[in-house]
A protein has these predicted regions:
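N-terminal flexible/basic segments that precede or flank functional cores
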Residues: 1-17, 69
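Short basic helix-loop element that most often maps to the first helix and adjoining turn
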Residues: 17-36, 61
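Recognition helix of helix-turn-helix/homeodomain-like DNA-binding domains
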Residues: 38-53
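Short, conserved catalytic or interaction motifs in soluble domains
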Residues: 49, 74-75
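DNA major-groove recognition helix of helix-turn-helix/homeodomain DNA-binding modules
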Residues: 57-72
Length: 76
């Protein structure tokens, strides 16, 4: 059985990959997303790499910049 830390690491990595895919679909560099979202390019790099436990406020800024919407947590 996997521990909590490895599960969270995998979720951060998957979220980062999703953000990267949306950004590149827009044809944007990381710096462009950072500027539009009002965060640093270093944060974008860390988030996309799955190395940053991003908070909901930053996620909301990124989603807004990408024209996406954050969804509520739903039970499967």
């Amino acid at each position: 059985m996997r521990d909590k830390d490895s599960i969270l690491k995998d979720k951060r990595k998957a979220m980062g990959e999703s953000i990267r895919a949306m950004r590149t679909a827009q044809g944007w560099e990381q710096e462009q997303l950072a500027r539009i979202a009002g965060i640093t390019a270093a944060n974008v790099r860390s988030i996309e790499a799955g190395k940053y436990a991003v908070n909901i406020d930053v996620l909301n800024k990124i989603a807004g910049a990408l024209g996406a919407e954050l969804r509520m947590i739903e039970k499967e």
